[in-house]
Amino acid sequence: MVADVLLTHFNQLFCLNDPGHPLTGQEMKKATIVEDGYIAIKDSLIVALGSGEPDAELVGPQTIMRSYKGKIATPGIIDCHTHLVYGGSREHEFAKKLAGVSYLDILAQGGGILSTVRATRSASFDNLYQKSKRLLDYMLLHGVTTVEAKSGYGLDWETEKRQLDVVAALEKDHPIDLVSTFMAAHAIPEEYKGNPKAYLDVIIKDMLPVVKEENLAEFCDIFCEKNVFTADESRYLLSKAKEMGFKLRIHADEIASIGGVDVAAELSAVSAEHLMMITDDGIAKLIGAGVIGNLLPATTFSLMEDTYAPARKMIDAGMAITLSTDSNPGSCPTANMQFVMQLGCFMLRLTPIEVLNAVTINAAYSVNRQERVGSLTVGKEADIAIFDAPNIDYPFYFFATNLIHQVYKKGQLTVDRGRIL
């Protein structure tokens, strides 16, 4: 087979044999590091991988050849938890955070999520589209090729749908692949204050059926937290969403452990998000149900909290984990997955191999894209992040700098030295 594109002489390729399930426990520590590696691409797919000189049959008169001495290649990075589409920003809350005002106290004062809800409700489709596109561009420049994007800053049907429509439009227009999550249950809207059950009934009866019918989202999510939605309320919504055919995610055990992990395990959610306050029993329940733990260390960093999710304990117990930005305007205003990956080492005490497995193959399972992306594997799409680094440890050791040299998306050179092509 003659390749369309042949990428050669990488210092290292980060490869693994996809076992057919998210990596857990000791599997997280394993990878195949190919020295002097090459990748052959044809029709957007990886068709060959190896070390040294490529087979002669891969090279034809039209084959594009590129050498990458001094560089490494990983699968395209996957950010599997973002709140991508929103109006406004919340830098005016930063001084309060520095003064020690808590996230929940800011929310109780009418700030936080509810502040962004007001800004998003007043934002036009074009405004939301352009703002979200800028964030996606930034993510792409940092090596991200697949992104999960939630609604949840409308809390009414008109605005929630506008958010989902923005995600759908960007999925068509932007190089990054988007996976949509419906999260109208992100907070209790002011018009339903004191009556969350009535709001959940509106979501179940009036919103979810339309989201499903119009294929606007693949996943359904809810914020199970003190002063937001209880475990029983979360179970009520997610069980109905599951009956309609949605895959499930749940924000759980972020600020307090109130039973969200139990709901995730009972309903076999694909992932439980945050988990800073998870208990040993909660870890065991998620392992038993095969739920992926999606950890968001940049949120803990941004909130200036001391308690990070117990990632080391999770992996050692046999749990599958991922890492994501939680990109949002309040608790985590960043879109930089390289920073998150570095926090995975510095604050969660993971190794570079564990982090790379978390943000590639496990993240692919978290967004139900494991058949297409998540590993440098023959037959998968050629989503490739190329780092200006001599080995896979270097991007973690040399922190707070964008080390992306190039990005390939579906076999096409999409980013080249800081420029989107």
From Swiss-Prot:
Chief location bin: cytoplasm
Pfam families: Amidohydro_1
InterPro entries found in the cross-reference section: Amidohydro-rel, HutI, Metal-dep_hydrolase_composite, Metal_Hydrolase
Cellular component GO terms, alphabetical: cytoplasm
UniProt enzyme class: hydrolase
Pathway stated in the Swiss-Prot or TrEMBL entry: Amino-acid degradation; L-histidine degradation into L-glutamate; N-formimidoyl-L-glutamate from L-histidine: step 3/3
Keywords: Cytoplasm, Histidine metabolism, Hydrolase, Iron, Metal-binding, Zinc
Domain of life: Bacteria
Location in or out of the cell: Cytoplasm
Enzyme Commission numbers on file: 3.5.2.7
Catalytic activity as recorded in UniProt: 4-imidazolone-5-propanoate + H2O = N-formimidoyl-L-glutamate
GO molecular function: imidazolonepropionase activity; iron ion binding; zinc ion binding
Similarity comment text for this entry: Belongs to the metallo-dependent hydrolases superfamily. HutI family.
Protein name (database record): Imidazolonepropionase
The organism of origin for this protein: Streptococcus pyogenes serotype M4 (strain MGAS10750)
Chain's gene name: hutI
